[in-house]
């Protein structure tokens, strides 16, 4: 799947500080709409930055598990995305990704050549009538259903 350039300019990513550790990566993050968070010191500030981005009508890509899978299975979802969606009344567009673990297993630094990764954008989930927990569960359920995981 490709995202149009115009959409990408309005799209932000959420990344842990440990992944943006050197000056070059920090420079690239600033130039490419990456909101960097420090789990120990700046969590509240980074959530506020994401809220401001959403209030301006922009998009944020958040990986709800907060990390890569260690075994190829879907892990527990963090609630940050559900809180932002519910508090700001913005929809969530779940994305089902398959083949990423096979292409780059835990502990590897280079992907396997010619690996196929499928990305599927699912129907939006609207926060109305949901708690943070139920919103998170609906999103997870739709992704699992799309990936044919029981």
What residue ranges belong to the model's regions?
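Non-catalytic C-terminal accessory region of glycerolipid acyltransferases
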Residues: 45-150
């Amino acid at each position: 799947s490709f995202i149009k350039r115009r959409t990408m300019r309005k799209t932000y990513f959420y990344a842990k500080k440990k992944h943006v550790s050197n000056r070059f990566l920090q420079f690239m993050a600033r130039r490419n709409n990456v909101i960097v968070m420090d789990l120990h010191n700046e969590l509240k500030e980074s959530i506020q930055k994401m809220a401001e981005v959403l209030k301006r009508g922009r998009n944020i890509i958040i990986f709800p598990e907060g990390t890569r899978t260690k075994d190829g299975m879907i892990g527990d979802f963090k609630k940050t995305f559900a809180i932002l969606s519910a508090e700001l009344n913005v929809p969530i567009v779940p994305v089902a990704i398959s083949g990423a673990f096979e292409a780059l297993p835990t502990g590897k630094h280079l992907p396997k050549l010619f690996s196929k990764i499928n990305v599927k954008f699912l129907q939006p989930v609207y926060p109305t009538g949901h708690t943070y927990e139920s919103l998170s569960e609906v999103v997870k359920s739709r992704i699992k259903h799309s990936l044919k995981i029981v």
